[in-house]
Amino acid sequence: MTKSVRMFGGLLAACGFLAAQPALAETAVRFGVDAYTTGSQIWVAEDKGYFDEEGIDAQITTFATGVEAIDALLVGRADMSVGLDFPMVSRIQGGKLKVLAGIFHSTPGFHKLVVSNDIQEPSDLKGKKIGIATGTAEHLITIKYLEENGVSPDDVEIVGFTSLMEIVASLRSGRIDASFVWADGTEKSTSDGEHYVLTDDSAAKLKGSAYIAAASGFAEEKPEAVVSVLRALDKASSFIEANRDEAADIIASHTRAPRDTVRNLLEYNAFSLALGDYEKAGFDAVSEFVSRSQSTEVTFATGVDASFLTEAVPSAVTLAE
């Protein structure tokens, strides 16, 4: 291009004669998240502009629990959702969702076992009513805790609930005697002086992770969008690890948990996208339990599709051959 042509083009642009370049079309992606911190990377990716950078129009719906967020995939209310390992693994067998990546490791201590004051050791739980958030990771933690501490689940009465606040209210009213709780539920369930924290989820001896999954149909129809989402979440993971205080501000502005609670909860998670031996070991432990309880075999090989993360963040896939 000659200098005179460039100058003429610049003059036309300055005078408004050249049409503005159209913005790149964004792909709409419907996300399902819980009301606490499992969706941390999604909120950060939205607020920091990482989705925009990757051409994603994020449409985020908050559900009471991760279970509901995952179920939204199965009924067509979400394209991608995040959740902890147990509810994710227990819903794979229908083939309607693909697990794409681990999004964080859960370090011990997130769930606290709150019990009535008359319960002093695990054996005291026999004959008691124990609340669970049915189908969640807390459900599995409860069962594994009992088994690890010599208490058969058959020796207690399991009472199912659909939300943390239901569990808290039932503890305080005496409807149940014990339950693993989390987030602000710990303080709310012990402030009456009639309950205390006996232990935390480390006593269940599980390797916990959270995952992001996509509806199988969406992943097959829009694989580029799935890869773009994973790239955005990888950026968000790095931001959270380096800026926990600011991340807590962002996450709390979108969730039901107070800012200080969110900041504390972030300390129980190591945020990074990954598919490696850690994720596989944790997945296998959950799938063994699911296969036993549902009489349906669930495996890492059939439930996880590493191809999307391999394209998005190759270094994040470290599975042994």
What name fits each language-model region?
Residues 78-82, 172-176, 268-285, 311-319:
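Short amphipathic alpha-helical segments at helix boundaries and their inter-helical linkers
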Residues 9-19:
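Bacterial N-terminal signal peptides
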Residues 291-321:
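Conserved C-terminal helix/tail region of periplasmic/extracytoplasmic solute-binding proteins
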Residues 79, 86, 165-253:
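Pocket-lining segment of extracytoplasmic ligand-binding domains
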Residues 19-25:
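Sec/Tat signal peptide C-region and signal peptidase I cleavage site
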Residues 220-296:
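Secondary-structure end/capping motifs
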Residues 26-152, 158-161, 167-170, 177-183, ...:
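Short, glycine-/small- and polar/acidic-enriched structural segments
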